[in-house]
């Protein structure tokens, strides 16, 4: 079988971009079991409840749901187990320092295969207040309406 090239998206956490202000992003490798990789290759995963915790100098991904592999036997994995993230020491120290200082949290944004290896995009994020969410939604809607108006104007259709 030919080696995979490029990036193949498995799961995306759209809720994280809605609930948090994203400050910085990192790409991390994942330590996975065989049946987890097979389940991911089927495109089955959920990042909705996921978060990253740094414990004794190691980054761990919690709450990510990778369902059991359908053809797996007794060697199948637990669906919501914690998984170790592979990051450089400098990155782990920087993330830990910023989380402790500024009260930020670390959330997963996307899970994908990059050149055949499972990767997760994690982000340092700060929680949005409910009025922030409403303001962002209103701004997005206003931008959409102006783009539609410009598009209609360019096509010759007047309001």
UniProtKB/Swiss-Prot annotation:
Kindly give the Pfam families that the UniProt entry links to this protein.
SmpB
Ion transport listed as a keyword? no
Spell out the residue ranges making up region: Disordered: 137-159
Keyword set includes RNA-binding: yes
Give the GO terms filed under biological process for this record: trans-translation
Annotated signal sequence range: none
- Composition skew (Basic and acidic residues), residue ranges: 137-147
Q: Which GO terms describe its molecular function?
A: RNA binding
Compartments reported by the entry:
Cytoplasm
Q: Which UniProt keywords are listed?
A: Cytoplasm, RNA-binding
Q: Which InterPro entries does the UniProt record give?
A: SmpB, SsrA-bd_prot, SsrA-bd_prot_CS
* Gene Ontology CC terms: cytosol
Q: Which residues cross the membrane?
A: none
Q: What does this protein do?
A: Required for rescue of stalled ribosomes mediated by trans-translation. Binds to transfer-messenger RNA (tmRNA), required for stable association of tmRNA with ribosomes. tmRNA and SmpB together mimic tRNA shape, replacing the anticodon stem-loop with SmpB. tmRNA is encoded by the ssrA gene; the 2 termini fold to resemble tRNA(Ala) and it encodes a 'tag peptide', a short internal open reading frame. During trans-translation Ala-aminoacylated tmRNA acts like a tRNA, entering the A-site of stalled ribosomes, displacing the stalled mRNA.
Q: Which PANTHER family match?
A: SSRA-BINDING PROTEIN, TMRNA-BINDING COMPONENT OF TRANS-TRANSLATION TAGGING COMPLEX
Family per record: Belongs to the SmpB family.
Q: What is this protein called?
A: SsrA-binding protein
């Amino acid at each position: 079988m030919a080696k995979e090239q490029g990036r193949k998206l498995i799961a995306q956490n759209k809720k994280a971009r809605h609930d948090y202000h994203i400050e910085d992003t990192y790409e991390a490798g994942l330590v996975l079991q065989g049946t987890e990789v097979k389940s991911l290759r089927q495109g089955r995963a959920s990042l909705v409840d996921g978060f990253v915790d740094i414990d004794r100098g190691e980054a761990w991904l919690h709450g990510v749901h990778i369902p059991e592999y359908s053809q797996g036997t007794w060697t199948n994995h637990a669906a919501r187990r914690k998984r170790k993230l592979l990051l450089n020491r400098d990155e782990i120290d920087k993330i830990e320092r910023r989380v402790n200082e500024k009260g930020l949290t670390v959330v997963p944004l996307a899970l994908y295969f990059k050149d055949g290896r499972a990767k997760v995009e994690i982000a340092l994020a700060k929680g949005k207040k409910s009025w922030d969410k409403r303001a962002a939604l209103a701004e997005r809607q206003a931008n959409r309406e102006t783009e539609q108006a410009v598009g209609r104007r360019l096509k010759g259709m007047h309001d």
